[in-house]
C-alpha cells in the first residue's frame, strides 16, 4: 500500500497526528527526523552546526531510503519541501498531506528553542511559514487544517487517508 506522508511546519502536529493515524490504520509510523538521527549517528542540531546543507543532504538520503518502503505513515521534517527531489521521491510511493497550522498557534504552543531553525525565537515561525507556504501547498495532495481538537483533526486526516488508499483500508478500519 502507498505511504501516507505528512508535511508541514515544525510544530504543526505531524508527529503527534502521524503516530495516532498509524495506530488507527494499523501501520508502522516513522518520524523522518528520528530516523535521520539514527542513521547519521548525529543529532539534527549537530548536523546544522556543520551547515544547513549538511543537514539537508542527510535529509535527502533519509527521504530516498523511506520512499523505497511501503505502507508507512511518515512524518517528515518541516523543511523537506526545500528540495524538490524529496517531494518527487515521496510522491512516487505515497500521498502527501499538508498539516496546515497557523503560525501564531505554533509560536504559542511549541518550545522553539528545541528546534534548530526556530531557535532565534517565535518570530522565525512567521518567517518560515511565509517562505514555505507555497511549497507546502504545491507539494500536497491534500491539505488538513490543524485547528480545533486533536481528535477532530485526526478524524479529518483519517478519512482523507482512507479515501486516498481506496476500498481496502475502508474494510480494515470499518469507516
Question: Which residues are covered by each model-predicted region?
Answer:
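Hydrophobic anchor at the beta1->P-loop junction of P-loop NTPases
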Residues: 6
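P-loop (Walker A) phosphate-binding loop of NTP-binding proteins
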Residues: 9
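Conserved glycine(s) of the Walker
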Residues: 13
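NTP-dependent small-molecule kinase module
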Residues: 16, 20, 24, 69, ...
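Post-Walker A helix-loop "phosphate-sensing" segment adjacent to the P-loop in P-loop NTPases
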Residues: 23-32
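ATP-dependent small-molecule kinase phosphotransfer cores
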Residues: 31-80, 84-88, 135
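Short glycine-rich anion-binding loops that position phosphate/pyrophosphate groups of nucleotides
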Residues: 78-80, 102-104, 149
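A glycine- and Lys/Arg-enriched "phosphate-lid" helix/loop adjacent to the NTP-binding pocket
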Residues: 93-134
Amino acid at each position: 500500500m502507498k505511504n501516507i506522508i505528512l508535511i508541514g511546519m515544525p510544530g504543526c502536529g505531524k508527529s503527534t497526528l502521524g503516530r495516532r493515524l498509524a495506530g488507527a490504520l494499523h501501520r508502522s509510523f516513522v518520524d523522518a527526523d528520528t530516523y535521520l538521527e539514527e542513521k547519521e549517528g548525529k543529532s539534527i542540531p549537530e548536523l546544522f552546526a556543520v551547515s544547513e546543507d549538511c543537514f539537508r543532504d542527510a535529509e535527502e538520503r533519509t527521504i530516498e531510503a523511506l520512499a523505497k518502503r511501503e505502507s508507512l505513515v511518515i512524518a517528515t521534517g518541516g523543511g523537506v519541501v526545500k528540495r524538490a527531489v524529496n517531494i518527487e521521491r515521496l510522491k512516487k510511493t505515497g500521498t502527501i498531506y499538508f498539516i496546515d497550522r497557523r503560525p501564531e498557534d505554533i509560536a504559542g504552543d511549541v518550545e522553539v528553542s528545541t528546534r534548530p531553525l526556530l531557535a532565534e525565537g517565535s518570530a522565525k515561525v512567521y518567517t518560515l511559514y511565509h517562505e514555505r507556504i507555497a511549497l507546502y501547498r504545491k507539494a500536497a495532495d491534500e491539505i488538513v487544517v490543524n485547528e480545533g481538537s486533536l481528535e477532530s483533526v485526526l478524524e479529518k486526516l483519517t478519512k482523507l487517508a482512507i479515501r486516498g488508499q481506496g476500498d481496502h483500508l475502508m474494510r480494515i478500519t470499518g469507516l
